[in-house]
């Protein structure tokens, strides 16, 4: 049987050393669902945002969000978040997810969840084993970057208000960065929750206002 190795001679002996093909490096994509990114947002990145463009009247807000992403590492370390306010369809969630993707790429354990899902999950888990509830709530309270999508869309009751207040206050005190998207105005947020919730967020967040129309212009992401 003919050897496929490399023939060598040493001390009067002939032998073959194995010949292995060069290693093939396969890049494994992270399972984004573990960070709360699912469905139509799985391919959402800053490159995708560039293709989609931005409404002309929201260029300043988009540029501020891009600037936040450029300095993401320092913002996460200092607990500085973002509040993105405006009508449905202005790209707030897409921006938030693109920033979260950047954080994941930098090694941070971020998480995205809608407010409805957050509170539904807490309610369901509260009726089961305590360790499951505590594990989930611990992640919400302690992950370096939490994205709360559609803030204010959840049902209104005292338990919800107190739980939201508790989570946000805890994250502010721990110096954890939070990104919030909401269709509500400042006045409506203060009406839905204790005004202290918004005040706490305002102290530790950049606030961006979106106006939004369907027409979109090219988006410059060269700084990213």
Sequence positions of predicted segments:
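Pre-Walker A adenine-sensing motif
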Residues: 63-76
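Walker A/P-loop nucleotide-binding motif
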Residues: 77-96
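P-loop NTPase Walker A phosphate-binding motif
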Residues: 94-108
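Loop/turn-to-beta-strand initiation segments
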Residues: 108-109, 142-145, 174-180
């Amino acid at each position: 049987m003919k050897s496929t190795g490399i023939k060598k001679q040493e001390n009067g002996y002939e032998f073959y050393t194995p010949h292995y093909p060069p290693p093939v490096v396969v890049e494994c994509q992270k399972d984004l669902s573990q960070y709360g990114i699912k469905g139509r947002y799985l391919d959402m990145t800053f490159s995708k945002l560039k293709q989609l463009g931005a409404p002309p009247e929201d260029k300043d807000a988009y540029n501020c969000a891009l600037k936040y992403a450029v300095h993401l590492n320092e913002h996460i370390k200092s607990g500085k978040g973002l509040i993105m306010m405006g009508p449905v369809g202005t790209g707030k969630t897409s921006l938030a997810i693109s920033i979260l993707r950047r954080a994941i790429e930098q090694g941070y354990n971020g998480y995205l969840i809608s407010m409805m899902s957050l509170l539904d999950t807490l309610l369901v888990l509260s009726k089961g084993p305590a360790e499951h509830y505590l594990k989930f709530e611990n992640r919400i309270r302690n992950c370096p970057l939490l994205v709360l999508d559609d803030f204010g869309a959840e049902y209104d009751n005292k338990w919800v208000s107190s739980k939201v207040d508790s989570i946000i206050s805890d994250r502010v005190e721990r110096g954890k960065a939070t990104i919030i998207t909401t269709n509500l105005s400042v006045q409506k947020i203060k009406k839905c929750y204790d005004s202290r919730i918004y005040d706490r967020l305002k102290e530790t967040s950049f606030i961006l206002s979106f106006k939004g129309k369907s027409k979109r212009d090219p988006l410059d992401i060269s700084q990213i």
